Amino acid sequence: MRVYSLPQLTVPQLAAIAPHSGLLPWDRAQFSYIDQSRRLAELIQIQMAQRFRGTTDTPFEAPVRQLRTVAAPAVAIEVSSVSVADRSSLDQMGPGLADGVARAVAAFRTIY
């Protein structure tokens, strides 16, 4: 189980992508929320580590294209296993996944 947020940008990188027209380009919508997204990813990853054996408690950073267009705190969650021959065991993770995400979002709402 992996939770992803976008990588942190440096000040020169932010200046290079700042819109000049005052309009927000869709591919840059997430940049104002990177810190909040990272915190949300941390909370969700901790919940996943508590529920699923072998899951790290540290979230990952990756340039996930779909996250760049979200103008709010956002993460991507990857559910997969290379050692599971039968997908039904992954399907059984659903309730634990949903509960963990719900608890993390509830905790995040108190700090957002």
Residue ranges and their predicted role:
Residues M1-Y112:
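Active-site-proximal helix/loop segments of hydrolytic enzymes
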